[in-house]
């Protein structure tokens, strides 16, 4: 939670991301499945919260604990796993329009590449943390803009 606070304080939305929030379809809803221990959530939740604020009420977000909502989580698996965070985007009629998560595509590819190498698999957490530190939530912002465009 300290990481979430720190990232929230220094986060600056790109103009394009702020505009995407402002131009989101009214009634857009995000159900975000997460857990407090999740490192990927610590990186993405500040961005999602900032976009919700920037949307002036066009996007309404709710965070749900994954482990208390496994029936929902099991409808949005990533490669067969309950990977989080997972954003489920709904329209004003509560129909699913899209989903996103658990991390940006580039980071997901990095994790898969590292985990597939037995000599490097134990370093995946450290390597992912370095990637996030270098990227500074830019990929998350790009992919959240894409998510909003599918509303």
Identify the function of each model-found stretch.
Residues 43-44, 74:
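Short, conserved acidic/polar surface loops in the N-terminal third of protein domains
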Residues 60-64:
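General small-molecule cofactor/ligand-binding pocket signal
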Residues 1-28, 50-57, 73-83, 91, ...:
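Non-globular targeting/processing and membrane-anchoring segments
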Residues 65-69:
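Short beta-alpha junction loops
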Residues 29-35:
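Short glycine-rich or small-residue beta-strand-to-loop segments that form or flank ligand, phosphate
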Residues 86:
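Conserved beta-strand and immediately adjacent loop positions that scaffold enzyme active sites
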Residues 45-49:
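Histidine-anchored nucleotide/phosphate-binding helix
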Residues 36-43:
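Conserved redox-active cysteine motifs that mediate thiol-disulfide chemistry
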């Amino acid at each position: 939670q300290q990481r979430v606070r720190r990232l929230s304080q220094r986060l600056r939305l790109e103009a394009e991301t702020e505009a995407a929030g402002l131009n989101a379809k009214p009634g857009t809803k995000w159900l975000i499945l997460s857990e407090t221990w999740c490192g990927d959530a610590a990186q993405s939740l500040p961005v999602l919260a900032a976009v919700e604020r920037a949307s002036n009420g066009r996007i309404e977000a709710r965070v749900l604990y994954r482990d208390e909502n496994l029936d929902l989580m099991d409808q949005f698996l990533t490669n067969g796993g309950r990977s989080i965070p997972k954003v489920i985007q709904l329209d004003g009629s509560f129909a699913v329009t899209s989903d996103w998560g658990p991390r940006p595509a580039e980071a997901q590819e990095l994790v898969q590449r590292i985990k597939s190498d037995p000599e490097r698999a134990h370093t995946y957490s450290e390597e992912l943390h370095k990637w996030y530190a270098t990227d500074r939530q830019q990929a998350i912002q790009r992919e959240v803009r894409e998510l909003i465009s599918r509303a």
